[in-house]
């Protein structure tokens, strides 16, 4: 995933935009993982994990974004897709050795706290997101990101986040909904949008498939 917007308060809201190669297979949200009962998310059919996991009974969600930095060794590398599943299920961020993972940002959110673990391939950085509306991108909590500068003020001012994703895809670096046709013919684009709302008595998960077909 490439973009996550979080709004704290009595109603915790998360919106994620998943950018990926259009030919990478996936399926929509469900309880796909017997090892994590009660956890819902879309599943990456290549690696088996997820980019956003929700545990409704625990009033908790976790989101995974690709990061920048030093890649893991190919001989020992493992998928990052299990990180959001484990975090949503256990309510804990990973401890210990992270060197088997490529760089990432992992957000763990509930009604009391929103935590961020950023791993650049060399050292982990742990922080809490501030109260209000924040935006996490592939460079983390980055106020200098073109996407953050373009869209964070709009999300802060808007009561209808869905309206902000109903725009034409663009190859612009600052666009929220993207579409890049690469020289080799492959398509890298925003494939789906997830909006999760967590309240003391209710959790909702809205999933929007942005693709007309899985081949782009």
Language-model-detected regions and their locations in the chain:
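N-terminal nucleophile
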Residues: 1-216
